[in-house]
Amino acid sequence: MSRDFSRTVRVADQIQRELALLIQNEIMDPRVGMVTLTGVEVTRDYAYAKVFYTTLGGDENIQLVEEGLKHAAGFLRSQLAGKIRLRVVPQLQFVYDESVERGMKLSRLIDEAVGKA
């Protein structure tokens, strides 16, 4: 069982590396600007992959980037099929990662609390 888990993690890491390169070098959509992939979760059967990303800008920029990534998902999946060797290349679902933003807010709150003490 642990062997299957480690393979899933390795596949997710490989997908993250390859997608980062593809987004940087192949996607020409102006909506997809500075995107950082923060993680990938792959289902056990490798049918689906949640790709977590962050981007610079406000809420309207997040919406534009998400639309651009969803539009490019089919292209990215086909390019990914040529880069990695899997029987089934997972369908990509892009999800904005709010953890970085939440971490910055918590850090700011801690700094304010320490400053008052």
From Swiss-Prot:
Keyword vocabulary terms for this entry: Cytoplasm, Ribosome biogenesis
Pfam families xrefs: RBFA
Keyword Cytoplasm: yes
PROSITE patterns from the UniProt entry: RBFA
Localization: Cytoplasm
InterPro entries: KH_dom-like_a/b, RbfA, RbfA_dom_sf, Ribosome-bd_factorA_CS
GO biological process, one term: maturation of SSU-rRNA
Alphabetized GO MF terms: ribosomal small subunit binding
GO CC term, one of those recorded: cytosol
Primary localization class, coarse: cytoplasm
Cited function: One of several proteins that assist in the late maturation steps of the functional core of the 30S ribosomal subunit. Associates with free 30S ribosomal subunits (but not with 30S subunits that are part of 70S ribosomes or polysomes). Required for efficient processing of 16S rRNA. May interact with the 5'-terminal helix region of 16S rRNA.
Record text on subunit structure and interactions: Monomer. Binds 30S ribosomal subunits, but not 50S ribosomal subunits or 70S ribosomes.
Protein family membership: Belongs to the RbfA family.
Record's protein name: Ribosome-binding factor A
Species the sequence originates in: Nitrosomonas europaea (strain ATCC 19718 / CIP 103999 / KCTC 2705 / NBRC 14298)
Highest classification ranks of the organism: Bacteria, Pseudomonadati, Pseudomonadota, Betaproteobacteria, Nitrosomonadales
Gene name of the record: rbfA
